Design a protein with these regions (language model features):
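Conserved Radical SAM active-site core
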Residues: 2-143, 153-181
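Positively charged, polyanion-binding regions of nucleic-acid-associated proteins
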Residues: 150
Length: 184
């Protein structure tokens, strides 16, 4: 039954914005002149279990981690990109991005259900790097329930951004063949 109370947003306070400068950020690739809310980069763990958003863990404090564990707020959807800490720092343009992966260990040890995502960038986190990441992520089974591997989306509005190449049909076939080896 409706309590008759309405909140302006589901968080009841301010959304947390992203402090990364990812080389693949889709918001940086949007055309100018759209509504302001489309340009907001969220990285808020509360939106992960409430709305299914993916978070990088770089904006998450120890207090946030402990709260997720204490209240069993799950699933948490994590945008991994890679399990190579140095490469993750490069891809997210955040020197703390590699250390943020340690939070996954805390979630695993507490039995928190997780889902993962890897935004695949050609020549950066594909090939052997992707193989390594998937192998590392299997260590979090059964609490890491899924890992989505999605090719980077590229728009025509990339001037001044990190140079990324689109995947060709042949590239995609190779990636899929490698991923299929890991599927159960």
């Amino acid at each position: 039954e409706d309590f008759g109370i309405e909140f302006e947003n589901g968080l009841m306070d301010e959304y947390r914005s992203c402090h990364n400068k990812c080389i693949f950020c889709f918001i940086d690739q949007m055309p100018k002149g759209m509504r302001d809310t489309l340009y907001f980069k969220d990285d808020d763990s509360r939106l992960s279990f409430l709305q299914g958003n993916y978070v990088t863990l770089t904006n998450m404090s120890d207090h946030d981690v402990n709260r997720i564990i204490r209240y069993h707020l799950e699933p948490i959807n994590i945008s991994f990109q890679t399990m190579n800490p140095e490469l993750r720092c490069k891809m997210l343009n955040n020197r703390f991005a590699g250390d943020a992966l340690k939070k996954v260990d805390a979630f695993y040890e507490a039995g928190i259900v997780m889902n993962g995502q890897i935004v695949l960038c050609k020549g950066i986190n594909d090939g052997e790097e992707l193989e390594f990441s998937i192998r590392e992520l299997t260590k979090y089974h059964p609490y890491l329930e899924s890992v989505s591997v999605v090719p980077v989306g590229l728009s025509k509005y990339r001037e001044g951004l990190y140079p990324l190449e689109p995947f060709t049909k042949e590239d995609a076939k190779k990636v899929l063949a490698m991923i299929h080896k890991w599927q159960k």
